[in-house]
């Protein structure tokens, strides 16, 4: 985005994604920007299927909100990786699994939700 439309457009995308995550998450969830254009959403008391459903809602919500730059509508899409844990889990390990799943989504064609398997960590 930054390379084609400038840093302001990239910043607008970051804000769009952040607002979507805040709007669709619960008060008990944690939304964090982990750097660049990546975010982490921690969903306590949510199973892997529930996380996948929310990730798909987030993906669809963002896809329905194109960015307008210089009177040009620019589609915005996201690739989301989902990972789960039963009980307590190390945040680094969980984040790493979600990141691997996100890269799987990108390799699969972008604008997708992916998880590595159906078993939580």
Where are these regions (language model features)?
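Conserved long alpha-helical elements within nucleotide-processing catalytic cores of c-di-GMP signaling
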Residues: 1-22, 32-36, 40-41, 48-56, ...
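Catalytic-core segments of nucleotide cyclases and related cyclic-nucleotide turnover enzymes
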Residues: 52-55, 70, 85-116, 120-121
């Amino acid at each position: 985005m930054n390379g084609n439309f400038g840093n302001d457009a990239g910043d607008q995308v970051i804000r769009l994604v952040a607002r979507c995550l805040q709007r669709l998450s619960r008060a008990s969830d944690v939304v964090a920007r982990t750097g660049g254009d990546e975010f982490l959403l921690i969903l306590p008391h949510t199973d892997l299927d529930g996380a996948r459903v929310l990730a798909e809602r987030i993906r669809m919500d963002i896809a329905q909100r194109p960015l307008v730059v210089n009177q040009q509508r620019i589609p915005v899409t996201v690739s989301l990786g989902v990972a789960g844990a039963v009980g307590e889990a190390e945040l680094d390990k969980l984040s790493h699994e979600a990141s691997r799943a996100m890269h799987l989504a990108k390799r699969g064609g972008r604008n997708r939700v992916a998880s590595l398997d159906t078993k939580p960590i």
